[in-house]
Amino acid sequence: MTVFFRRMAVVFLFISLLTLCCSCQTTPSSEVPTTDTPTTDTPTTDTPTTEVLVPNAASDFDYDIFEKDGERVIRLIRYKGERTDVVIPDSIEGLPVRILLGVTKQNENGYTGVVQGVFEGTAIESAYIPSSIRSFGLATFAHCTMLKQVEFAEGCGITSLSTSCFEDCTALTRIDLSPLTKLMGTYYAFRDCTSLEEVVLPEGMTIIDEGSFLNCSALKSLYLPDSLEKIVKNAFDGCIGLESISVGKNLRLYEPAASNVIFNSHALKSIIFRDGVESLDGYAMFSITSPVSVEVPASVNVVSGNTFFNYNTMTITFAGDCPKMESEKWLGDVIVRYNPDKMGWSNCDWSAKEGTLTLEPIK
């Protein structure tokens, strides 16, 4: 009997161990820690997704091979694809796409010129321009009235947008030109872009050409980069919605040959001259037809009444010492606000013509 119970005890122990092992192997997976697999609550901000841009096929374009500066390159002639979200390829047939030329034709005098831009008049809605592009032909995107978005790749070596490049792109609301650090030419580039509200100009740009933003009536604010030296007449004619302008330190205000003012907006409310500007000795730069606030940094040492054609009330606040007044008196009703702790204001003898001048210390 004792032997029997011993044998039964051994069997019972064996069965218990077997049951325990089986229960360990069948533990529900939901109870197993999942530290190697992130849950749905794990933030994904550390691994942002990047949209993959798929270039248009070469068959979407008429193009040719051209030798420029010892390099064989592709020139795009005309877009014939159906995609409305255009991604210009950076290479075709193993050669870099360098020039958005357009359709050319030789006239009776033997001169060959562009008669139709690459995308002119098409129904495209967006365009991505790769860094391989170096130049645009006439009216590249002109009259693309459905075009809403344009993106330039970083490192674009474009120096000129060509005449009427984006003319009459009436659906375009914003354009960021900051990647185009070598940009020089913008001749009538955005004429009649009547929905354009915001423009980001590149640091490195030195001139805004004639008619560049002609009739951009929805443009509300403008930040002029420090590199900008000159604005040619008519550049902002018809920008009747422009409310604020920030002026960089290198803009030359004096433009004696100008036949009209550079900024003439009835909506203008604020003009800010940024630190580093030394002279406000300009001619017909701003037409003041509504109450305007002007901020002048301490770096300014020369001012001129000719800079502002004031037909309303202008409040101009000086941060530094009283500058020297060159040429004409202030025009219209002017309120000058100044810091009484700065030099020269107690002896200020400024005056106004066709209006009143009020000196008002900042308390």
Tell me the role of every PLM-derived stretch.
Residues D41, D46, N347-K363:
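C-terminal capping region of solenoid repeat domains
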Residues M1-F12:
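Bacterial N-terminal signal peptides that target proteins for export
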Residues L20-S23:
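C-terminal motif of bacterial Sec signal peptides marking the signal peptidase cleavage site
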Residues Q25-L53:
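Short, low-complexity, disordered segments immediately C-terminal to signal peptides
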Residues I65-E71, G81-I99, N107-S135, T145-S160, ...:
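Structural signature of tandem-repeat unit edges
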Residues G137-T140, S162-C165, Y187-A189, D209-S212, ...:
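Consensus positions within tandem repeat domains that build extended binding/scaffold surfaces
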Residues N260, S327-D333, M343-T356:
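Short, aromatic/basic amphipathic alpha-helical patches
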Residues L53-Y79:
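Short beta-strand/loop segment at the start of cytosolic alpha/beta domains
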